[in-house]
Every structure is written in C-alpha cells, then in structure tokens.
Regions:
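N-terminal glycine-rich FAD/FM-binding segment characteristic of electron-transfer flavoproteins
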Residues: 1-317
C-alpha cells in the first residue's frame, strides 16, 4: 500500500495547502509519494523534494501542463495510479476540478473533503453544512480522497531529500483550449491561509460601508471575508465569500461583523480558534459559536474599535 499525493503549485513554488495535504496523506500511510506536473517547475520540485514526509517525487514536465488544465492532468495521474492504492489532493478549487475526473477514469467512488483519517480505508467528512460528521469506509481497491486542508496541520517544509523520478507526459488533450487566467493581486494575506480574518455581512448595508471592514483589516494585517448575503447583494466580490459555497477558513482570529450566522456561513468558519461577533441582534445564530460577542450597532462599534487600534499603534510607535 502506498499513497500518491498530487502537489499543487504555480510552477514557481508550492501552494501552502500542499503541506496540509502531505500531513493527511502520511496519516493514511507513511510511504507518501508526490507527483508534480507542470512546465519549468524546477523550484517547486525542489521545495517538494525537501518535505521530510515525502519519500519520492515524480516529476512530469511538458508545455501543455503549464496552465494546470484538469483534462491534461487526469490521464497522466491515472497512468501513475497503477502503482498506488490511494490518490490524494486538497479539496479546494484545484482538487474539486481534478479528482472527480480521476475517480471516473478509475471507475472508483471519490471520498470528498475529509477532516480526519481513522484508518487507511475509513475517514470522517462533514455533512449537512458541517452540522454533522459522517464516518465513511471505502472498499474500493483504489481510493480517491480529497482532504479539507484546514483540518490538518502543515507538514515540516525542510530537511527532506526525496528521491526524484522524471516521467514523460502524455499527449495534449486538444478538445480543451486554455484561454487565460485572471488572478486577483493583493497585498493582503490570502483568505484561506490568513491568521486573522475580518468578515462583513448584509448588516454592512452597502458596498461603501465595507470600507469600515477594510480599515479594521488594514490595522490588523487581516484578510477580508464576507457572507454569501453580502456577496449576493453586491457589496463585495465573491472571492471573499466564506462558507459552504465559498472558502473554509480556520484563522487564529475571526471577526464577524453584521453577519447573522446562517448554517452555510458557519460551516466555513466555526472551527476558527477565536471568534468575535458584532451584531445588534442578540438572538443572531452567530453568537452561538462566538467566543466573544458584542450586541451593538456596528456603525458605532467599528469606529470605536478603530479609534482604539489607532491608539495602540501610536503607543507602539
């Protein structure tokens, strides 16, 4: 038995969640091999081979792998899967696009979004928007598993020296054509990996009022999140959405402002280490998961909070 981990990268460096996926993979079996598919990805390959938990790295290089299209990735991974019992990736956009194709080609059932490894064939995954957890056992000979990155600690990133094997790629899948990629560039921390997240909900009342969230986030060095209601209302773009249909976050500090706390939103943030809720409705569900709750008008509370943060900054200077 051995595990093949699909490494996520940008051809220059590993994506942070790859380290979390390695931890999950090593809980399935200590013999973890990783495959890195790309073009001119030598730096990412070097970083991957330095992970102590990875015993072997398979490198597949070709120009048509540069843009990470799942139609090109799936066939080569299926070919490599002949020697493995488990294929593992993160349950993010990358993994959700790729792993179902791999599972279909292997004619196996996918086990999705696991939060815990019980044994090499039994896993725990959330259901009902995170309000319950199911224990799932897979009897398939080959198991395709996606892991919720925030449920596993990142592995050590240095000190390893994995064996590197270079493998030729397959022919390009010509029915799909890559057009372009648009990436949001920001000086802020990435929402999925930020230590502090400040989120606003429908209670912000308008997009212009979200500048209050922005100011608080600037002072705290935080990422900006939002509820689906705020996104649907057009207050902020959907790449900030936290929840069942958005990003799942587990920061050290999550500040929810004007968010009532629908179960879909709670599913994306209730595992945060410390949760602070500000809402004028004392019966709002968000208070049921909050470590600290402030029943107040956010348009009065946030300016006062900013004033105190400014005082702290002045003292520190």
């Amino acid at each position: 038995m051995s595990v093949l981990l699909i490494a996520e990268h940008n051809n220059k460096e590993l994506r942070p969640f790859t380290l979390n996926a390695v931890t999950a993979a090593s809980q399935i079996d200590q013999d973890v091999h990783a495959v890195i598919i790309g073009h001119n990805s030598e730096e990412a390959l070097k970083a991957l081979s330095a992970l102590p938990a990875v015993k072997k790295v398979i490198s597949v290089e070709a120009p048509h792998y540069e843009n990470f299209t799942a139609e090109n990735f799936a066939p080569i991974i299926v070919k490599l899967a002949e020697n493995y019992t488990h294929i593992v990736s993160s349950a993010n956009t990358f993994g959700k696009n790729l792993m179902p194709r791999i599972a279909a080609l292997l004619d196996t059932s996918q086990v999705s979004d696991i939060t815990k490894v019980i044994s090499n064939d039994t896993f725990v995954r959330p259901i009902y928007a995170g309000n319950a957890f199911a224990t799932v056992k897979s009897n398939d000979k080959k198991k395709c598993v996606t892991i919720r990155p925030t449920s596993f600690d990142p592995c050590e990133s240095t000190g390893g020296s994995a064996l590197i094997e270079k493998v030729d790629g397959l022919e390009e899948f010509v029915q799909t054509k890559f057009i372009k990629r648009e990436e949001v560039k920001s000086d802020r921390p990435e929402l999925g990996t930020a230590r502090i997240v400040v989120s606003g909900g429908r209670g912000m009342q308008s997009g212009d009022n979200f500048k209050l969230i922005t100011e608080v986030a600037d002072k705290l060095g935080a990422a900006i999140g939002a509820s689906r209601a705020a996104v649907d209302a057009g207050y902020i773009s959907n790449d900030h959405q936290v929840g069942q249909t958005g990003k799942v976050v587990v920061p050290d500090l999550y500040i929810a402002v004007g968010i009532s706390g629908a179960i879909q939103h709670l599913a994306g943030m209730k595992e945060s280490k410390v949760i602070v809720a500000i809402n004028k409705d004392g019966e709002a569900p968000i208070f049921s998961v909050a470590d600290y709750g402030l029943e107040a008008d956010l348009f009065e509370a946030l300016p006062q909070f900013l004033a105190e943060l400014n005082k702290l900054n002045t003292i520190q200077k």
